Amino acid sequence: MDNNFKIKDLPKNERPQERLIRYGAEVLSNSELLAVILRTGTKNQNIMMLASSLIKETGGLDQLFNQSIEELTKIKGIGVTKAVQILALSELSKRFKTYKSGNEYKISTPLDVSNLVMEDMKYLKQEKLKILILNTKNIVTYIRDVFIGTLNSSIVHPREIFCEAIKKNGASIIICHNHPSGDPTPSKEDINITLRLKECGKLIGIDLLDHIIIGENKYVSMKEKGTI
């Protein structure tokens, strides 16, 4: 016998799916939208209770969408299937924000870079290095994660960075990485990596425009600091 509470076990006028059909998705709360996707609760919690507690326990949607599958499955009521559903939803959300309707994204200021990558990077538990490849009009043509782990100049090799830019016919690049501590203050290694990549870019003919360090809702631009 299946003891899991399902959406259909709720009164019809309280079912998120029915409310979505009748009133539109925009009127549903975050918990209701998550409930529509997860569909079933547990033997002790209906799906609305589970969705609400999941968002609360992880600290909100931003934090929920940056959990790993291991972290999600440690939460009571979340098995592998539900964890995978959440991760898939998270990735779709990030891709939509990054590639919104296929619109071109032009970089004019460091804030433009921050707006592009902040949601994806601000709560990461490990350091991640992204490369943004730009054309001659400073429009982002490609974004890729090139490294995950503690950054230092002996590990981050210019070859890996500029190889992507050459493949994609990039005119220039911007690199971004996060500090899991939430403090984006550049370390000595951050500065060394930046200067090394700047020099390599000059030799290759692909300019490093900036190195943005992401913290918790704040960032530091190496260009604004005068490092490059």
From Swiss-Prot:
Motif JAMM motif in this chain: 177-190
Keywords, alphabetical: Hydrolase, Metal-binding, Metalloprotease, Protease, Zinc
Listed GO MF terms: metal ion binding; metallopeptidase activity
Limits of the MPN domain: 106-228
InterPro entries assigned: MPN (IPR037518), RadC_JAB (IPR025657), RuvA_2-like (IPR010994), UPF0758 (IPR001405), UPF0758_CS (IPR020891), UPF0758_N (IPR046778)
Pfam families: RadC, UPF0758_N
Alphabetical list of PROSITE patterns matching this protein: MPN (PS50249), UPF0758 (PS01302)
GO biological process, one term: proteolysis
Binding site for Zn(2+): H177, H179, D190
Keyword Metal-binding: yes
Record family assignment: Belongs to the UPF0758 family.
NCBIfam families, alphabetized: PRK00024.1, radc
Protein name stated in the entry: UPF0758 protein CBO3003/CLC_2900
